[in-house]
From Swiss-Prot:
Matches recorded under PANTHER family: THIOREDOXIN REDUCTASE 1-RELATED-RELATED (PTHR48105)
Protein's recorded name: Ferredoxin--NADP reductase
Keyword set, alphabetical order: FAD, Flavoprotein, NADP, Oxidoreductase
InterPro entries according to UniProt: FAD/NAD-bd_sf, FAD/NAD-binding_dom, Fd--NADP_Rdtase_type_2, Ferredoxin-NADP_redctase_2
Co-factor note (free text): Binds 1 FAD per subunit.
Cofactor: FAD
GO MF, one annotated term: flavin adenine dinucleotide binding
Subunit (UniProt): Homodimer.
List of residues binding FAD: 33, 41, 46, 86, 121, 282, 325
HAMAP family (alphabetical): FENR2 (MF_01685)
Length: 332
């Protein structure tokens, strides 16, 4: 069994940065992520949206930021496993940990950093007829690449910020955009809703009944007025169902880490109640400190957790790695 200095659980921005920082500290690292692609919410929820609150980037597409984080994480050649769920952790007799996955694999490690965010993300589905049949054949739950919708007739289902933002984003490139919402009040920002009515056809009090197609792609959608039950058939090329994502932490609450709701309780060193186990990012909650779900905050927490873990492994190690600009490993 391969032994690691650190296993990082979660491949979002914080997990990726932690993996990089572990390499910077000369720690053999393994990154495990349950999603199909590294990047966390950046790629799963809003890859085509701009991110403005990460230092050094006045504005960057979420997907591009994720790609740069992945590139940085791979700098010191960590082992990476995606589409694999960290199912259980167990303490060994020699004071190490074994991380067991849903694929039946076991990884022995000196420390663990949990950066799982909200957990494995799966889209909320409506259960409309044809929805599952045409998933990824015209039915989508987010916009991965805006160019995929160029010249297409798009139907968006939802009334929150994501649904309205996608409508505004796609309107300039799509042939047409129609948005339906089951109520007449939107959860989205008021200004965005006003813009929505200028660029899209909007049906309030309407829901999706059925998605139709030719077996290979979507061709129509059936919507209905939930007050009168009157139906409309729309010719569409794509249906984006934007009603949210669910986060699943799996068996994590059974691992023995102290949790409050969905948060893992940590101290100022990002330590949990378990020796050698740390948490950072959205999943970490530090008592007495404000909780800010910001990528920038998570980066700092990851650096602290990795540095403390380094000293846990080697008490003689320096807590501070030094400035990267002065490290030989970065000099060519």
């Amino acid at each position: 069994m391969t032994e690691y200095d650190m296993v990082v659980i979660g491949g979002g921005p914080v997990g990726l940065y932690a993996t990089f920082y572990a390499g910077l500290r000369d720690m053999k690292a393994l990154l495990i992520d349950a999603q199909d692609e590294l990047g966390g919410q950046l790629v799963t929820l809003y890859p085509e949206k701009m991110v403005y609150d990460v230092g050094g980037f006045p504005g960057i597409l979420a997907y591009e930021l994720a790609q740069q984080l992945v590139e940085q994480a791979k700098m010191f050649s960590p082992d990476i496993r995606i589409k694999e769920w960290a199912d259980m952790i167990e303490r060994t007799q020699d004071n190490m940990w074994v991380v067991k996955t849903d694929k039946g694999n076991s990884f022995k490690t000196k420390t663990i950093l949990i950066a799982a965010g909200i957990g494995k993300m799966t889209p909320s589905r409506l259960g409309a007829k044809g929805e599952v049949e045409y998933e990824n054949k015209g039915v989508y739950y987010t916009v991965r690449r805006k160019k995929d919708f160029e010249g297409k007739r798009v139907l968006i289902v939802g009334g929150g910020d994501s649904a309205v933002d996608w409508a505004l984003t796609l309107a300039p490139v799509a042939k047409s955009v129609t948005l339906i919402h089951r109520r007449d009040q939107f959860r989205a920002h008021e200004r965005s809703v006003k813009q929505l009515y200028q660029v899209a056809t909007v049906y309030t009090w309407h829901e999706l009944k059925e998605v139709r197609g030719d077996g290979n792609r979507v061709t129509q959608a059936v919507i209905f007025d939930n007050r009168t039950k009157d139906e409309k058939i729309l010719d569409v090329d794509a249906v984006i169902i934007s009603i949210g994502f669910k986060g699943d932490l799996g068996n994590m609450p059974k691992w023995g880490v102290n949790m409050k709701g969905r948060d893992i309780i940590v101290n100022a060193k990002m330590e949990t109640n378990l020796p050698g186990v740390y948490a950072a990012g959205d999943i970490a909650s530090q008592e007495g400190a404000p909780k800010l779900a910001l990528i920038a905050v998570g980066f700092g927490q990851a650096a602290i957790a990795v540095s403390v873990a380094k000293k846990y492994i080697d008490p003689n190690a320096s807590l501070f790695a030094g400035h990267s600009s002065e490290m030989d490993k970065f000099k060519k």
